[in-house]
């Protein structure tokens, strides 16, 4: 059934839709299956995403037609279609009238992902109008609150030096806590790796008690505040709340030094919102493990990394992993810095829409995945600043002189970049950074040709 007369209006102007403020706009790359027209398939897509189905139904009235999702732009050659969704379509909480990402996903990338006439469709960007934007929780905390705990300026406080305890699984409570203590002697921040929780060989409560003790000892020994991000992810919100409360009680006077890690992609919006609403005074660390199945550039379905990041900010993530933009081991490219800008800026330009975030607090980019001291300057050059949480697992624990030296090498690389000094030159007076060149020699050869001669290190 051709539904284009009802669900397509190519006379609508995007500028007018934005000015009107009553539509969420979504841009997709869509390809119909052979034998199906582009506009007709786009119309069916919009119908299935809003008020329609594959046949006309007798219960449809004029009000229903007034909230149809409408295809307002198509470029068949580029495979681009844009759809305007009236804000009235989206579900809202009965307890407080707030909007929900679950409803946004259900409409915009729900049944339309399995339609028989659609070969593939991937959302590349979306726009939220100002009034509707205020119905999302947004972040309660961000990197500024970490800087405050660390005693830094709350504006442009610089990189938070972090790590992930490795191996990601297999450490019992004491070795895990000992590794935390060692890193904290040189670094700022430690996170649970995403699968770490309450394994039989590492009971959650035993581990957290020992980590809290390691934090106290490291702070006493260094005179500096330390930070820990604890994984509270679970299927059951009650379990998440129980874990979170136990951690706050266990860390006691250092409760403000704790973040809560939530595996937001695999556990979903409910898990993120459970943390955001039950622990608004705690940094909400959104880990995106699993997202590549949907967001990868190789995938032609689902949604993009940018869409994922924008949803995380709406949900209330204090910080989210953004990848390393091609400078680490994970898939990515330098032009993905727009992802970080969309998280941290009050207004940012996406591939299709300019999003004004109004008064919504910024979300912090968390950088991880194959980073070490030698890779940081190039990353910061590309991003244009260093106001990120950076977590290096192998980059710290793979240092030839151990995790303390690894942490210090990361800090020294940041110092060199901030001062505009070449890394090789800075390494001449900083043994930990010099050790990073030896520890990650293949990176050194690629990024800093001639480093061995300048540092007088034999091959």
UniProtKB/Swiss-Prot annotation:
* Site (Transition state stabilizer) residue list: 329
Q: Which residues carry this modification: N6-carboxylysine?
A: 191
**What gene name is listed for this protein?**
cbbM
Q: Record-annotated residues binding Mg(2+)?
A: 191, 193-194
Bound how, and how many: what does the cofactor note say? Binds 1 Mg(2+) ion per subunit.
This chain's protein is named Ribulose bisphosphate carboxylase
What Pfam family does this protein match (any one)?
Answer: RuBisCO_large_N
This entry's Gene Ontology molecular function terms read:
magnesium ion binding; monooxygenase activity; ribulose-bisphosphate carboxylase activity
